[in-house]
Structures are given as C-alpha cells and as structure tokens.
C-alpha cells in the first residue's frame, strides 16, 4: 500500500505529518505535483513531477493508484476515481470520502460550479486551522491502523 498526495495545493503542515507517518510506518509516500517540491531525504518518500495542465497530476494519480492505497486530495472528482479503483481518499482537513458520501459530494460540487458560473459568489474554503491539522492527523492514524490489519 502507498499514500499518494495531490501535492500542488496540499498545506505544508499536512505534508509534514505525512513525512513523519511515512518514516514511522515505512509506507511509501508519493507526492505528485506540477512543480518542484522539497521533501526530506528518505527511502520512503518520493516526488513525481508532472507537466503543467488541467488535471494532469490527478490523471497520473488515478493511473497509478492501486486498491487499498490512500490519496490525499480535496479534489472531489479525483477522490471519486480513486474510490472507484478501490482506493481510499482523505482531504487535508481530515474528511474521508467514501462510497456512501462521494456521489452527494459530487452533486454539491457540481451545484456550486453552476452557481459560480451564473455569477453568484460562494467564497473559498476557510484558512487551514490547527483544528483541521489535528483532524487530518487523527484520520490518517485511523487509516494507518486499518492498513496494518
């Protein structure tokens, strides 16, 4: 099993948690981005740089993810593709995407896209907080505990 990160928009605090987890568990951690990313020297951590472009990193993750792998992303369509392939998806804020909730999340995303296209401003996500950092760390620990079994 591996942990894949949609790394271009992933908060640094989450990356730090993931670096520690990769070292602690010896689980492969792959950060996929269209720019260079600094990572600690480790045999468990690597980067995969892709070309710039719409969904290029997402498509590369979907192509490589295996059943049981975890993907860290806030991209709902990417999460849906990962779940379809038998993987798990978690946001950097600690929310888990599941077979039970992904369709509803896609519907809400599509609705919000329609609202934005019609000129209604919806705002963006709130700044990343310490509470969300803890929620992510706890959700990651739950996944790692399940993966050990």
UniProtKB/Swiss-Prot annotation:
HAMAP family: UPF0178 (MF_00489)
Family matches, as CDD domains: PIN_YqxD-like
InterPro entries for the chain: UPF0178
UniProt-listed Pfam families: DUF188
Family the UniProt entry places it in: Belongs to the UPF0178 family.
Protein name stated in the entry: UPF0178 protein Tola_2809
């Amino acid at each position: 099993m591996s942990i894949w990160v949609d790394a271009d928009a992933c908060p640094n605090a989450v990356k730090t948690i993931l670096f520690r987890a990769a070292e602690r568990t010896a689980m492969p951690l792959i950060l996929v981005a269209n720019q260079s990313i600094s990572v600690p020297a480790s045999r468990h951590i690597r980067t995969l740089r892709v070309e710039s472009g719409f969904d290029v990193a997402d498509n590369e993750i979907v192509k490589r993810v295996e059943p049981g792998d975890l993907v860290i992303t806030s991209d709902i369509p990417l999460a849906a593709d990962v779940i379809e392939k038998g993987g798990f998806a978690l946001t950097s804020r600690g929310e888990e995407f599941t077979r039970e909730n992904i369709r509803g999340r896609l519907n809400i995303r599509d609705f919000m896209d329609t609202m934005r296209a019609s000129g209604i401003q919806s705002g963006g996500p709130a700044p990343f907080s310490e509470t969300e950092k803890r929620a992510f760390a706890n959700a990651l620990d739950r996944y790692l505990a399940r993966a050990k079994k």
